[in-house]
Amino acid sequence: MSWRSPQPVSVAYREILEQSYRGELSLLQAALPSRFQPSIQACIDSLDSIMSLPMVLLHRDLTSSNIMVDEDTCHLVSVIDWAEAEVCPFGLNLDTLEMLTGKLHRRDGWIRYEDHAALHTGFWDAFSREVGGLSEQQIKLIKIARMLGLLLSRGFTSRLADQPKPVPIGDDETGRYNTLSLDGFLINPQTKFDVTG
């Protein structure tokens, strides 16, 4: 488990990463609608603490199409497409849990699968058991890191290695599609992230 095997990084690396996140969050503050401002501000306010989380190798494009599962056993076989992987604070790609336990409709937004609550409870119980000794405050911080990861991925245009430099989303097809995820996970009371410990 990556939490127990953090990657060694220099103080300078952490500082550069934090400056990058701060700059990108500032861009989102200027570009995204007001309904997202409380979430952006919560990430800014927690950024110093987020940077104290274990630094781990994160798959930055962890989607259902990049996860290979054995059809008969439903066991994980492999994870592909590591081109955008980077060392970041733990939790920045946990928004993937939402995307794997629900589906996005262009008209209705995010809809959770019937077993969503059981899957999430199972994940957090297993994680807490494996890691051991996490306080409610640490779990809350991980959940805010998840929100930061969502904003950095869905608040911007594509971050793929072969694409132009990402910019905040706008009122185009990509922007509207990503806004559905931001609304679903940050605003909609039925599907928004739980950020409590």
Regions found by a protein language model. Name each.
Residues 1, 20-23, 42, 57, ...:
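Alpha-helical elements of Rossmann-like donor-binding domains used by nucleotide-donor carbohydrate transfer enzymes
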Residues 57-59, 79-80, 149-156:
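Short beta-strand segments
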Residues 65-94:
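Catalytic activation segment of kinase domains across protein kinase-like and atypical kinase folds
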Residues 34-37, 88-91, 117:
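Alpha-helix initiation and capping sites
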Residues 87, 96-197:
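Helix-rich C-terminal or lid/interface subdomains of diverse kinases
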Residues 2-7, 80, 102, 131:
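Protein kinase-like catalytic domain
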